[in-house]
């Protein structure tokens, strides 16, 4: 009897090791696709995006949640890198700043070709898996980055953007952010304005994943109901587990289930436990809850590494993913469910977005009304001279007659 008692700790250790061994085995063939990492923002803050700076060497970078050895230890096989610029750039230099962050992501791939493979589609992710590299994709974090322009949206797509978060923690002129739900911001669009609906439709047409992290509940509902393709929450958790407005409420999780969409769980302590402290088990609680409400196909990982100041014990950096997967296995997740959360759910959503795209369809052209824009740092070219599509026929004809007279054609 006493001999058995002394063996209990050994049995527990062996069992724990078995779960982690199984996690590693699974991740060797199905590495994790993480929905959101802010390493590019750290490269801007620390080194002004100068990757040749010896201190910025990603094989030995210190003081960040992410570097190349940590990515390899964590079996990260694909990463949506955040091209983020803060809300105070809105109506100023947000487009320039976004372009610079896309550029630094692309230069990461050029400087470390043995580690990173910049890709723009689901097939590229699978190619990177086969080559043992980290598929690197661009996620633009905040609708203010397109400066309320469908033309800029299209240009960012052509530069590699494959998801756009409709807002950051600020309203755009066409979509509301999560602070509306706390009362700290006032609703401007009641979810999505008419132009916001045009943005969603153009993203569907192009094949850009719609990301609803950071948006208000009304914006979540509007986008989920309007989009022809599944959407993602690239770094959000479950509101019923932690009642923080950055998390996803149950009725929206039902819409996620109905639309085949995806919630990629955020690891930030404040969203995990609603406290300054959190642990790995509490992150698993969010994964369990989303699986329970929306189904195993609705679960993914969006750690928000290098974008947050506090992380759970046991998930201190990107190398810790196998420990979280081991916890899911301990909680009797099936291997199929784990592979889904690791990668297959995101690949399914990405493929559905690609299939719903239609580049033969005419692109959206109607601009946002000038009156909805803050005018202090912008010109009004196009608005003052171009006839509106909403003019009455008689008014439009009069405008054409005036134009033809000026050209001496009448």
From Swiss-Prot:
Origin superkingdom? Eukaryota
Indicate where this protein resides in the cell.
Answer: Apical cell membrane
CDD domains according to UniProt: rDP_like
> Any idea which UniProt keywords this protein has?
Cell membrane, Dipeptidase, Disulfide bond, Glycoprotein, GPI-anchor, Hydrolase, Lipid metabolism, Lipoprotein, Membrane, Metal-binding, Metalloprotease, Protease, Signal, Zinc
Q: Where is the signal peptide?
A: 1-16
Cellular component annotations (GO), alphabetically ordered: apical part of cell; apical plasma membrane; extracellular space; plasma membrane; side of membrane
Q: Where is the lipid attached (GPI-anchor amidated serine)?
A: 384
What does its activity-regulation comment describe? Inhibited by L-penicillamine. Inhibited by cilastatin.
E.C. number: 3.4.13.19, 3.5.2.6
Per its UniProt record, the required cofactor names are: Zn(2+)
Instruction: Name the chemical reaction catalysed here.
Output: an L-aminoacyl-L-amino acid + H2O = 2 an L-alpha-amino acid; leukotriene D4 + H2O = leukotriene E4 + glycine; L-cystine-bis-glycine + 2 H2O = L-cystine + 2 glycine; a beta-lactam + H2O = a substituted beta-amino acid
Q: What class of enzyme is it?
A: hydrolase
Q: Has UniProt tagged this entry with the keyword Metal-binding?
A: yes
SUPFAM superfamilies xrefs: Metallo-dependent hydrolases
What are the binding positions for Zn(2+) 1 in this chain?
Answer: 36, 38, 141
Keyword Ligase included in the entry's annotation: no
Residues binding substrate are 168, 246, 304
Q: Which residues are glycosylated?
A: 57, 62, 279
Subunit relationships: Homodimer; disulfide-linked.
Q: What does this protein do?
A: Hydrolyzes a wide range of dipeptides including the conversion of leukotriene D4 to leukotriene E4. Hydrolyzes cystinyl-bis-glycine (cys-bis-gly) formed during glutathione degradation. Also possesses beta lactamase activity and hydrolytically inactivates beta-lactam antibiotics.
> What family does the database annotate?
Belongs to the metallo-dependent hydrolases superfamily. Peptidase M19 family.
Q: What is this protein called?
A: Dipeptidase 1
């Amino acid at each position: 009897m006493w001999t058995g008692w002394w063996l209990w700790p050994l049995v527990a250790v062996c069992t724990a090791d078995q779960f982690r061994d199984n996690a590693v085995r699974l991740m060797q063939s199905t590495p994790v696709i993480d929905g959101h990492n802010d390493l590019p923002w750290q490269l801007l803050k620390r080194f002004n995006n100068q990757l040749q700076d010896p201190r910025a060497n990603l094989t030995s970078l210190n003081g960040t949640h992410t570097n190349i050895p940590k990515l390899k230890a964590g079996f990260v096989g694909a990463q949506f890198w955040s091209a983020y610029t803060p809300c105070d750039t809105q109506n100023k230099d947000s487009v320039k700043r976004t372009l610079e962050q896309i550029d630094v992501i692309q230069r990461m791939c050029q400087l470390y070709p043995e580690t990173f493979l910049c890709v723009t589609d689901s097939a590229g992710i699978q190619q990177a898996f086969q080559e043992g590299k980290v598929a690197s994709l661009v996620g633009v974090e905040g609708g203010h980055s397109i400066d309320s322009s469908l033309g800029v949206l299209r240009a960012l797509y052509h530069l590699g953007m494959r998801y756009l978060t409709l807002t950051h923690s600020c309203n755009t002129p066409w979509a509301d952010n999560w602070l509306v739900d706390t009362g700290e911001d006032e609703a401007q669009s009641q979810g999505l304005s008419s132009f916001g609906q045009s943005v969603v439709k153009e993203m569907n047409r192009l094949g850009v994943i719609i990301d609803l992290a950071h948006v208000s509940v009304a914006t979540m509902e509007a986008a989920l109901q309007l989009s022809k393709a599944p959407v993602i929450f690239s770094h959000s958790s479950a509101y019923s587990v932690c009642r923080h407005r950055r998390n996803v409420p149950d009725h929206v999780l039902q819409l996620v289930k109905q639309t085949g969409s995806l919630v990629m769980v955020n690891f930030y302590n404040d969203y995990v436990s609603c406290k300054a402290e959190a642990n790995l088990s509490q992150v698993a609680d969010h994964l369990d809850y989303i699986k329970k409400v929306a189904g195993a196909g609705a679960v993914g990982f969006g750690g928000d590494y290098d974008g947050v100041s506090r992380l759970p014990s046991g998930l201190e950096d990107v190398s810790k993913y196998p420990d979280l997967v081991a916890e899911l296995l301990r909680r009797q997740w099936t291997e199929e469910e784990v592979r889904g959360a690791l990668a297959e759910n995101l690949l399914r959503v990405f493929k559905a977005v690609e299939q719903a795209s239609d580049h033969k369809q005419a692109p959206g052209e109607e601009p946002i009304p000038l009156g909805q824009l803050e005018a202090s740092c912008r010109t009004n070219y196009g608005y003052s001279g171009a006839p509106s599509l909403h003019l009455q026929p008689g008014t439009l004809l009069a405008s054409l007659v005036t134009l033809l007279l000026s050209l001496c054609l009448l």
